[in-house]
């Protein structure tokens, strides 16, 4: 596992811990009305991200076009769908320390930029155009080569694929 991969794995583990802390609080306060299947979708999405970026599949992506395309499908289609299907907003917010939510998340969420971004986030056409744009961008030979030759740009590519997938699915997943 490379340095950047280790950082991503740590972020995924930390996010899972925050999610389950919040999920437990939400489950206690809502009388158990959160379906178990929904809570399982979140770690499954994170696991698929890990499989796409750190498993044998990741080591084969330079050699096999099939492995490369499976990575793209996992990062842009399957993992984001599962993460969003879990409805992670409340569990993640409740899992964070209260002081952090009050002093950082709250003020940031009330900014004009946050309101502007949330307005765009739900517009189907915008989400699809950005998602397609990200995919096209990374297949321009110059950027594709940079992602293959430099670990940092490969991480940026995968992160943008995941972000584009989350954006793509956000107006569609209830």
Which residue stretches match the model-derived regions?
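Alpha-helical membrane segments of multi-pass proteins
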Residues: 1-174
